[in-house]
Amino acid sequence: ISVNALIQNALVEFLSHHHYEKHLRTLRLSLERYKKQFYHYLKQHLPAICEIYYYPSGYFLWVKLPHKLDSMQIYEELIQQDIGVAPSPLFSVLPAQQHYLRINCSFEWNEKIQAALDQVIKTIQQRVEASL
């Protein structure tokens, strides 16, 4: 078993000429821009009872749902529509932490992304209204 020398040499060239650092700077700026777009859109359209946590690092937003809502149920509804969010039980077993959704913001904004976010918002709104 051997390594492809051409690919290995190209990688050495890429890394040794600081192209990687430039790529990372560009990527970080893009991810930050995408995250801000997601944040502002969700902030504008989610029910006021929901909180959005914007942490300075990473490309995820956390949406805190009302305590009555179960993030697993919302996840299951959305996954049936091919929309992926991460419910908090994937990250915590504490009962007090079961009402959060993690949203991946690493995607460039387009009509498909907006339609998916609109469906996330609609699903949360329906659950909030049903819980009142």
Indicate residue ranges for each PLM-predicted region.
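PLP-dependent class I/II
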Residues: 1-132
